[in-house]
Amino acid sequence: MIKIFIGHYINVFYSTADITLKKQPLLFLAKLMVYSAALTFFTANFHCNMTRKINEYA
């Protein structure tokens, strides 16, 4: 599920980046920053939930 979710974000990012990359590089960097922040948030959230589940059974 995580791979599908990450793959979706990468595909959306590349489809929008192809159009705007040539004309507006700052917009490209802003979108890159937003998507990387979202990916970091979801990864940290997944890691936190996984750690909590492990600690419940320890």
Curated annotation (Swiss-Prot):
A Pfam family (short name) is YecU
What does the induction field say?
Answer: Expressed in both exponential and stationary phase; expression is higher in exponential phase (at protein level).
Q: What is this protein called?
A: Protein YecU
